[in-house]
Amino acid sequence: MKKPILILLNLLLFINFSSFSQKKKKQEHHPLDEISINALKWRSVGPALTSGRISDIAVNTQNPFEYYVAVASGGVWKTSNWGLNYTPIFDSEDSYSIGCVTIDPNNPNLIWVGTGENNNQRSVPYGDGVYKSEDGGKSWKNMGLKKSEHIGNIIVHPKNSDIIYVSAYGPLWKKGGDRGLYKSVDGGKNWDRILYVDEHTGVNEIHMDPKNPNILYAATHQRRRHVYTYVGGGPGSGLYKSTDAGKSWKKINKGLPPVELGRIGLDISPVDNNVIYAIVEAAERKGGFYKSTNMGESWEKQSDKYTSGNYYQEIFADPIDLETVYVMETWMSVTHDGGKTFKNVGEDFKHVDNHAMWINPTNNKHWLVGCDGGIYETFDAAKNWDFKKNLPITQFYKVAVDNAKPFYNIYGGTQDNFSIGGPSRVNNSHGISNQDWFITHGGDGFESQVDPENPNICLLYTSDAADE
């Protein structure tokens, strides 16, 4: 009996030693070094049939066939043939979320981009400051303000390209960061913060008087997002004016609601620089649409019209008609009497949820509008719309694949669009087109899963009004 016992002891010792060796190996295991995927070659499979969320549009006034599109989570795109083709020009940079794009009025090849979407939704990505291109978007350089996370807009002095103003919204989920209004007098090499309220308040918009570049108007917004709630306003929100190019500021809230304010959208009428419009979010539902006829010295309420500072609250004054102003919201609206009354512009056969607008300065019936469904163009003030079907910037929440043969299919749910599916490859030389993609359910879509044994069975998760 001694021999079997000895064998058993040896076996136990071997097992224990093996176990110890395995534990030691696990303990000595070092995390893998950073893996680069630069060697992988990516190809676009689309889709563009629903496009995606636009944050800004900048048109070259010297060549209206050329314009730039800032995408909430899809970089910057450029067209040189009025939308027949779009080219991604920001894919190699460190941020994919864009808040604004600005063309230098003195040099159309000098482009400024503010990263980090300029809205306050839960799904809003952050950026890493401002970028500058001196060759029409072929190459870029990060010019700083990396801790801003969200940029509202950028203005370049109309006679001096070295002078730039940046409205830094600041981090959405925390205090501090690069927050406030910044100015550079050396082309972005250095920045001075010329307007600052507090660590919770950023500047969401900066506007320059069209006749006097020393006169500036700034809107500040106190906001903070938490996992459990969103704080959309506070004592830091308000309007400010400078008459000395930002050296000094005064608050211009006279006539605005005497309560805590939220997000304020501004625009100066190109027809008369004495007239400024403001759409104001305020506590106790006291917000509304305001008008100043004395360059912001006082404000008069025109109506109760306001939108959501969480997602909209931007306005655009008509370049020809003094009394016409457009409001970006779920259904885009317009006033023709200076803000007293509003009506929807008409969006039949157009995606809603609007964020950006360009109005032709010589033909105010010709617009470009950016929404959650891409770029739309109208030549007759919204009676008819042309959808740009070649901008593949759809925001997918999640994607899944099936086991179909010969090529697997891709499924996913999208932000403010449908749940959709499409092929990974096709049997023709033209490649995948919008016609190859198909809608599986309404939106917002979120998650899709496909039966691994039967690719015809697809499970979908949707939110909001997808079943209506």
Predicted regions and their residues:
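Bacterial Sec-dependent N-terminal signal peptides
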Residues: 1-25
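Beta-propeller blade termini and top-face loops
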Residues: 22-463
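A short, hydrophobic C-terminal helix/tail in secreted or cell-surface proteins
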Residues: 464-468
